[in-house]
Amino acid sequence: VYTVFIQLLANTEKNMFKQDIKRIGWACKYLHPDQTQKTKILEELQRPLTERATTVAWLNRQTRDVAEQRLWDIMVHNSAAAKRLVEYVGTLIPELRMVRLGSNQLPCATHADWSYFWTRSDVVAYCDTHYRKVGDAARALDVRISMHPGQFVVLASDNPEIVNRSIAEFEYHANLIRWMGYGQKFQDFKCNVHIAGREGPAGIKRALQRLSTEARNCITIENDENKWGIEDSLELSKDLALVLDIHHHWCREGEYILPSDDRFKRVIDSWRGIRPAIHYSVSRADVLDGHSDSVRPNMPTLLAQGYKKGKLRAHSDFMWNHAVNDWALEFSPHADIMVESKMKNLSCERLHEHAQQKTKVARPTGVSNSDAGMHVRNVRRGCIRAKT
């Protein structure tokens, strides 16, 4: 019995990413470093690492055989693309080995007309085999992977049918997580949803009781930019791990919350010893046209000038504001940072380069200018290799 216990413990620990690395990650889609190329060329370059999709409308116009073949082909491509994406991220420096997988791995998986396809024994067997390879790659390369079901997943809705559909959608993600070999331990994998819906924390608590063990192990809740803020999500701190979205908090409260804030300390505690993740985005540069990139935007001032919160919520292409970046990076000693931006990995790499520039300023005593310069060049070479 003791031997079995030790083996189970060892297998569980293997699922965990290394906890001592300060990571910056990006979401879902790989972008080639040279975005000046023609659209068709970029599509060809990015396709091997990018999900394919289809629509219910297209499937419903086809014969059953044609539609099922399309779903099968997409499954084959998407499972391979997810593995290639993880393998690519595994070539980056350790601090950049973090990525969110897209949610559309298996299109129409919870749709009433097509969910049957994804329960076929041959389909389940294929997914079990090939998504396991995705998880194996992540574990072998120490890539922290996660997922984020769409905003239509409203576990705290006051409409029972919406809650039922939301649970089904979350369990679809849990199936993928299970196939990848995760969900065995609290937060060996992060699957995040917003604290949305009229029922708020109480609704989330009720929904949790209906989730599978793997789903409960992986679920995280982030604070909303509208109704449900940090104080609301903290009501769930004993039930699940919390994600602090610092842009959401700024949009809702106009506050640049600090890592020393007691609320963030309680967020950290909700992870039960696992390194937390936070979400970071900034308002679009074209919305704040003319704003200095060395000054943090001030919400009360912007509102007084006629800016609308709705436009300020939208994510930027790049993390263009250096002052806001400096603030966000203050969280790095305490949590990994998931960058939510339109330019995906390219934006993430720029933020990491900004962090490196800040680190270079604080050079250890006894390190010469030439040694420091060599270190900087080596770091940059590492980033350049990762981009090719």
Annotated model-derived regions:
Residues 1-15:
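Short, Lys/Arg-enriched N-terminal segments with co-localized hydrophobic residues
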Residues 15-144, 153-167, 171, 175, ...:
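Alpha/beta catalytic barrel-like cores
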Residues 102-103, 145-150, 184-194:
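Core alpha/beta catalytic barrel or barrel-like domain that forms the active/cofactor pocket
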Residues 145-153, 243-250:
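Histidine-centered catalytic micro-motifs
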Residues 163-241, 247:
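Eukaryote-skewed repeat-based solenoidal scaffolds used as protein-protein interaction platforms
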Residues 222, 237, 241-244, 252-259, ...:
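Active-site-adjacent pocket scaffolds in enzyme catalytic domains
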